[in-house]
A protein has these predicted regions:
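Cysteine-centered catalytic environments shared across enzyme families
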Residues: 1-236
């Protein structure tokens, strides 16, 4: 799956900008990135949302345990990969039909967060049990919400293209060609929200997240880590 967002929607994370500046490397534009995804995945589907957002996915080379799905409801777009262990109980909690799958559930959970503000954003993902990565884009508010499960069982990466777009994908090689060293693995147990202004841990929302510069031989430009209480105490 692939989500590409212009700087009008999300400001490129400073840590990824810095990583690309430390070790200059070839990049391509967001348009070239989307084109490459569509060309290398014959069954791919892409959706253009206005001038600033492109979402794409494919069932090609899909793991039976990590199926990809896409849905749109009430101008909320969602790409989901993985499976939820507690889908049944969550359907009841949100009053959904038994036919509702994970991607519909995530849209409803996000909508509950948006409409019940100030509802803590970490609650959207904190009660999801299983392995997952998802990208939510709310067209009505131009809000982006991205999350990865606490164990990082579903791969998710993010980077910055040559034209300053922020891209998320489950394929590191795809992003490497477009983002160079402005690339990192999306940290497990975390969510990124333009509504709250950045990256947070949904297990420990008050804990600081730092970006550690990666060695030159690594594919990444940086590694994001959630600091624990002991680490925070030592740095205060």
């Amino acid at each position: 799956m692939l989500g590409v967002f212009s700087s009008a929607i999300v400001s490129p994370p400073e840590e990824l900008v810095a990583a690309g500046s430390r070790t200059p490397s070839p990049k391509t534009t967001s348009t070239a990135l989307v084109d490459r995804f569509l060309q290398t995945n014959s069954s791919a589907v892409s959706v253009q949302v206005g001038d600033n957002v492109t979402l794409a996915y494919t069932h090609q080379n899909e793991s039976p345990l990590r199926q990809r799905s896409f849905a749109v409801k009430d101008e909320i777009f969602c790409l989901f990969e993985g499976a939820l262990d507690n889908l049944g109980s969550l359907r009841q909690q949100y009053g959904l039909a038994k036919s509702a799958n994970e991607v519909i559930l995530v849209i409803e959970a996000y909508k509950a967060l948006r409409d019940r503000a100030p509802y803590p954003p970490n609650h959207v993902v904190g009660h999801l049990s299983g392995y997952f990565a998802f990208i939510v884009y709310d067209k009505s508010t131009s809000t982006l919400f991205v999350a990865s499960d606490q164990f990082g069982k579903v791969p998710l990466y993010w980077g910055i293209t040559a034209d300053g777009h922020v891209a998320f994908a489950d394929d590191a090689d795809l992003l490497k060609g477009a983002c160079g060293k402005s690339l990192a693995s999306f940290p497990q147990g975390c969510f990124f929200s333009t509504a709250v202004g950045g990256l947070r841990s949904f297990e420990n929302p008050k804990n600081k997240i730092t970006a550690v510069p990666a060695a030159e031989e690594e594919i990444w430009g940086a590694t994001f880590k959630v600091e624990g209480p002991a680490v925070l105490a030592a740095t205060e």
